[in-house]
Amino acid sequence: MIKTDILIIGAGPTGLFAVFEAGLLKLKCHLIDALPQPGGQCSEIYPKKPIYDIPGFPEVLAGDLVDNLMEQIKPFEPGFTLGERAETIDKQEDGSFIVTTSQGAKHHAPVVVIAGGLGSFEPRKPPIPSIKEYENKGVAYIIRDPEVYRDKKVVIAGGGDSALDWSIFLADVASEVSLVHRRKDFRGALDSVEKVEELSKIGKINLITDAEVVDLKGENELDSVLIRHRDQARGEELKDTDHFIPLFGLSPKLGPIANWGLEIEKNAIKVDNAYDYQTNIPGIYAIGDVNTYKGKLKLILCGFHEAAIMCQSAYQRINPDKKYVMKYTTVSGVSGFDGSKKEAKKEVVKSIN
């Protein structure tokens, strides 16, 4: 049995930052995540993708953000149960909880925090009959390492931010990038759409609209895709490629958490945002993209804010007879459970007679 003060389900950026905020309050954390490494989608789906709206970072790669968070929480020695999914939760007589994972590991804590981002998720796959046989043989639904595509021919399908952004990024990596979208209009950010149009005009992206990839070809691995144009006069064309990457977004699922008796709204967990991001079950909180409330913004920076507020409430729940006096880290420094301490240099005061 793993015992901790706060059990966090989800080791994405929000869950990781919650470890830091809890550590400042001398609360120990343990994290459960179905993925084999911390970082959530930032590590699993877009580690090389730049993020522009993290305060203090004009630009930071998603993977680097995770690395920085891991370094930041290191003094607080969090525990991790990775590659296992939280399956069941049982409330104890004293109000604490036991959470059991898919591998049977039991975790006991007075506070449970669900920070699972979109929960469990899987990529939306296009209805191409032959697509399964080419998975990992030229077909991928997630770009983990852009270097795989260096000097290769790549066909990307999709009309959202991921398809646009990766087409732009790979234009400087791959030997040829083709972006196929079934409509003329894209659903992504305006500047990304304009950038794709600009790169298309100078021949760095082959933009194919009003068309779909309908079949895949190749002996032992992918070597071409069949593109069907909406304009019947253009018919179909067979395009040589080394890689086909359909980026149609993720299909989010809460998984077993949906059966825990929590109040769910549109595949998200309802919380009391006016106070502490607690759910309808006292002692269970939800922070980050997995929660919903009036005015909710699904941004990493908002998840950080929610983590800080949640930890204050968790402290009071765990220590009902204590009153925590908030101190700024610029004054108190950061004292880790490993004996380390970070603090500002003391000012030298000299009296003048």
Swiss-Prot record:
Catalytic reactions of this protein: 2 reduced [2Fe-2S]-[ferredoxin] + NADP(+) + H(+) = 2 oxidized [2Fe-2S]-[ferredoxin] + NADPH
Annotated keywords: FAD, Flavoprotein, NADP, Oxidoreductase
InterPro entries in UniProt: FAD/NAD-bd_sf, FAD/NAD-binding_dom, Fd--NADP_Rdtase_type_2, Ferredoxin-NADP_redctase_2
Database matches in Gene3D superfamilies: FAD/NAD(P)-binding domain (3.50.50.60)
Pfam families reported in the protein's UniProt record: Pyr_redox_2
The keyword Nucleotidyltransferase is annotated on this UniProt entry: no
MF (Gene Ontology): ferredoxin-NADP+ reductase activity; flavin adenine dinucleotide binding; NADP binding
Listed cofactors: FAD
Enzyme Commission number(s) of this protein: 1.18.1.2
Cofactor, how bound (note): Binds 1 FAD per subunit.
Binding site for FAD: 14, 33, 41, 46, 86, 121, 289, 330
SUPFAM superfamilies to which the protein is assigned, alphabetical: FAD/NAD(P)-binding domain
Subunit structure and binding partners: Homodimer.
Family classification: Belongs to the ferredoxin--NADP reductase type 2 family.
Listed PANTHER family: THIOREDOXIN REDUCTASE 1-RELATED-RELATED (PTHR48105)
Name of the protein: Ferredoxin--NADP reductase 1
Lineage, uppermost ranks: Bacteria, Pseudomonadati, Bacteroidota, Flavobacteriia, Flavobacteriales
